[in-house]
Amino acid sequence: LDNRAFVGYENPQYPFTAVFGAEKNHPFIKDMLDYYDNKSFEFDKNNQYDKVNTKTVSDILIEDYDCKIGNQEQMLREGIKVYKDDVLCNPSVNSKTIHIFTGTWLEGNSSFVRNVNKFIKLRLTNKSRLKLYSYYRNIKFK
């Protein structure tokens, strides 16, 4: 990837922060860090998703950098490249990385579904397996 900064979609509504990057001193990184000034980080067992930053970072991208929702590849102000979800997040033949969504930061026992999801995604090691996985997830390939 050759961009001043990059992020990808998690789903059609939200770019995500599991995988992102930027050159040194990029304003997008400063904007994300500024959000955390004066924030409390007490863990709430009853609302474990309360501090997940996907929505917050998406709002920064939409409001400050004119990102459009809808899982579309786009170039934003300050050279921020936004990739479709099949490049940096969800498994496909276009994947550079895969976000496994294991929820390791969640407290308590990991669920059976999360364990199965992790087991499957960790074995998507070649294009044949990605195509098979994508077929069953109803993702179309060219």
Locate the predicted segments by residue.
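Glycosyltransferase-associated regions of secretory-pathway enzymes
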Residues: 1-142
